[in-house]
Regions:
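A short, charged/proline- and glycine-enriched loop
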Residues: 38-49, 72-73, 150-152, 228-232
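Conserved catalytic-core segment of nucleotide-activated headgroup transferases in glycan assembly
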Residues: 59-63, 69, 209-294
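Membrane-proximal basic amphipathic "stem/tether" segments
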Residues: 1-44
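Conserved phosphate-coordination/catalytic loops
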Residues: 26, 30, 54, 253-261
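Glycine- and acidic
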Residues: 48, 173-175, 247-253
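Active-site and donor-binding regions of nucleotide-sugar-utilizing enzymes
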Residues: 49-215
Length: 294
């Protein structure tokens, strides 16, 4: 056992975790400084890659298209494998995501080739900026986690408009290690800086990309079966948290899902008011697997 490991073994877990994160943070800051200097000297467009996981939580269409229209950028989407729900689910979600982005006209790549059982090497893509859309470690294959992005700037734009002032929502290790954290509002920026202290990232409040679509007069409403404007439209989007926090069974703060309480009621309402109201069911992507566990 090395002297460093011996010292770490004598320290509280929280202090060891902070020390390890601090070392990563320092290394990342040096990496970003080198990359910025390289880009300043390069006379070419900037290669940006969105790391996408699930088409149902993709909120970055307007951002991708703005980059695609600007000669300064070369945007690409890399569909990353979700590895915490089994191989079948991983492959299905990758197929759905890839096909959706192809239909949108994106330049899109699969990170995993099922036929050859091989993964895309991020280094081979020669990326300048990687944009993360989900902060949680263990969700995607570690090949694509921030620890293994060695020669690119990294950014984070959340997959959701956060409404909860909890540290775990704003201070995951990835959120602290990125080059720039683009958040929704000044309120969110204050929370990021509060919870990530002293290892906070460069944080900028720029709004939320999907809300750009409210300015688009040609918004897509193809998801609605009926185009009858007299029908009211209701989207029911229950959260996945039908259980308490698995790390703390006494923590009920994250049990936000009302699915078990209202599922039968919502079916009854859809039938009762089918001539007056049109419903869309849009559950959180992992609600289904949590229901199987219930």
């Amino acid at each position: 056992m090395s002297i460093v490991h011996k010292i770490e073994s004598c320290l509280p877990t929280s202090l060891v975790e902070f020390w390890r994160l601090y070392k990563k943070y320092r290394a990342k800051q040096k990496q970003y400084a080198r990359k910025i200097e390289q880009l300043r000297q390069a006379n070419r467009s900037i290669r940006v890659c969105f790391f996408a996981l699930d088409a149902s939580v993709w909120k970055y269409d307007s951002l991708y298209r703005l980059m695609a229209q600007d000669p300064m950028f070369e945007p690409t989407v890399l569909v990353c494998p979700i590895v915490n729900a089994g191989r079948k689910t991983m492959l299905h979600k990758m197929d759905v995501c890839y096909n959706d982005f192809v239909k949108r006209g994106y330049k899109v790549l699969r990170s995993y080739d099922e036929q050859t059982d091989s993964y895309v090497d991020v280094a081979s893509l020669s990326l300048d900026i990687v944009l993360y859309t989900n902060p949680y470690h263990g969700l995607i294959d570690d090949r694509y986690y921030i620890d293994n992005i060695k020669d690119a700037l990294t950014c984070f734009v959340n997959y959701t408009f956060a409404i909860i002032p909890y540290k775990w929502a704003f201070a995951q290790p990835l959120q602290q290690l990125v080059w720039t954290y683009f958040c929704e509002t000044d309120y969110h920026k204050d929370l990021v800086l509060k919870f990530t202290k002293p290892l906070h990232p460069h944080c900028v409040a720029l709004g939320y990309p999907i809300y750009d679509e409210f300015h688009d007069a040609k918004r897509d409403d193809s998801m609605w079966k009926s185009k009858d404007k007299s029908l009211k439209r209701i989207i029911w989007a229950p959260h996945h948290s039908i259980f308490a926090n698995e790390e703390n069974e006494d923590d009920v703060e994250v049990r936000w899902s009302t699915f078990l309480l209202y599922s039968e009621f919502m079916v009854q309402m859809a039938k009762k008011y089918q001539d007056k109201v049109q419903f869309i069911f849009k559950p959180h992507p992992i609600l289904r697997q949590n229901l199987y566990k219930h």
